[in-house]
Amino acid sequence: MRTGPLPIAVLAAAAFAQSQSPNQLEAEKTFDRKLAAGANDLFTLDLKSDQMVALKLEDQGTDVILSVYSPDRRLSRAFSSARQKGDALEFLASQPGRWELKVAARERNAPASYKISDLKISNPHAPALQEADVSPRIRKITNQAEADAFWKEIGPNGSPLIEPIKDDPIHRFTTFLWRGSADTQRILLNFRNCSPDPVDCFLHHVEGTDVWYRTLRLDHRLRTTYLLTPNAPALAHGTIVDDDLLSQISVRQQRDPLNPKATIWDSEQNPDLPVHRGSSILEMPDAPPQPWAGKRAGTPAGEIVKQDFASALLKNTRPIFVYLPPGYSINAQPYDLLVVFDGQDSIDIVPTPTTLDNLISEKRIAPTVALIVGNVKEMRGTELPCNPIFAEFLNSELIPWLRPNYNVTRDPQRVTIGGYSYGGLAATCAAYRHPETFGNVLSQSGSYWWTPPPDPSKPDIFTPGADPSYVAQLFVNSPKLPLRFYLDAGSMELDRDGDGSSILVTNRHLRDVLRAKGYEVFYQEFQGAHDYLSWRGTIADGLIPLGGKSAGQTQPGSAQMPRRN
């Protein structure tokens, strides 16, 4: 006959059957209780779905078990006072209704004493806010009538709501909004750097109304994108967002229905509903203009020639696009040359040909031929990250093919190679290896956190941040090369892990190294994230200082002037 401690599951089942009349647990109330041998106590809590319960369970020398039952009387959780050691225990209500908490001694024939205290019930998606972090306009909403007036006031296109902050000229209260319905349980803001803890990115609900909101303090020059996820999975503080959870969030996310400004680069190819195409755009009042990115009536347009190019070195074939400036002639003086990556994206999304049309028309750069190099399917992450074979392909196959077929310069000081993200890294490494061909580097949010793979035969397996100074060290260890640089990075391309591996940190490091070595470097930090929305404008910020010498220009030409040393 067994007389020792019972397993928790068995004990919980017995407790359910033998419970006394229930006690209602109350916040800020302490329960000091004694249990006779074989007895147990029953407590109840009326909870809403996804509410989080926290409380302390302490014993007086004999371990007690607190078992949590959902409204359908299923065992949900079980906690041991001995294991908690005075720390708060937490559980999440998976369904609304009356939950039951049963307390019994682990030793079934032993008496016990225990204490329950510090009960707190909260919504995991609604952490407490300081009053200063709430939109002044939202604070005025206390009932549905006031909410109706608010929605009428801001109109159908009123999100995000942007308000000034007293005594803070740099930031603005920026409030993301959602008009809820009876089915709305929670709304997650998918916004780069909203918070290291995703729980802090849930919108808050103004009780008794259909208003959901999340207010952030954001720079008045910011330009970036965001999405909203209605009825995202419930999260608790410290939740690790793994691939499965990320999928659950991604499948629900959509554009902001209250914001008509959106990135819909693939609208013609994407058959999905409009709300699921692209991302919503946040442009703060003083976001710098992007005067060169849009087509202009009356501005002559260049010609784009497309063909496939087979590489013996890489053993593959890719699309390439050659942009010819307006009035291109084989009898003219050789044209400046721009080489960029990512093919069609660098035509449609980052509008390189349109930008060149506008800059050439305004004589901000010399007439320029552009070679836009396409990607081979699934090979971008292998070819672009500082791959010496890819650099050799550019230098020994692609450029030698281009020169006899098009009227382009052989002077490396009039050749710029550039790209964004991995493209910026590829441009830097290609110029480092072949300065006799590429004299200028235009890097937008270059991925200088990259480190070589430990096994060269497996180029996709590496540890980001293992050596975030790798690219900078190449220039430290080499003589000064005949190169000029434009580098940029976004304020939201931050280092969250403290390992120095972010795009912002590694761009600053490379800038400092290059300047210390005596290189001419144009550098700027824009208020934005790692996305096309900023790169559409900053490509001109790089082309003007790097290509302006040929057109008699020496200073950057946009509202955002890169610093020149």
Regions found by a protein language model. Name each.
Residues 34-86, 94-97, 102-109:
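Acidic, Ser/Thr/Pro-rich low-complexity intrinsically disordered segments
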Residues 46, 90-93, 215-220:
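Short, flexible loop/turn segments at beta-strand junctions in immunoglobulin-like
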Residues 17-51, 124-126:
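Non-catalytic extracellular/lumenal accessory regions of secreted precursors
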Residues 21-25, 43, 70, 100-129:
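C-terminal edge strands of extracellular/lumenal beta-sandwich accessory domains
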Residues 41-43, 87-89, 210-214:
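Short strand-edge motifs at loop-to-beta-strand transitions and within beta-strands
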Residues 51-53, 62-67, 112-114, 183-187, ...:
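Short beta-strand/loop motifs in extracellular/secreted proteins, especially
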Residues 9-18:
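Hydrophobic h-region of N-terminal signal peptides that target proteins for export
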Residues 128-198, 202, 206-565:
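Non-catalytic cap/lid and distal C-terminal segments of serine-dependent acyl enzymes
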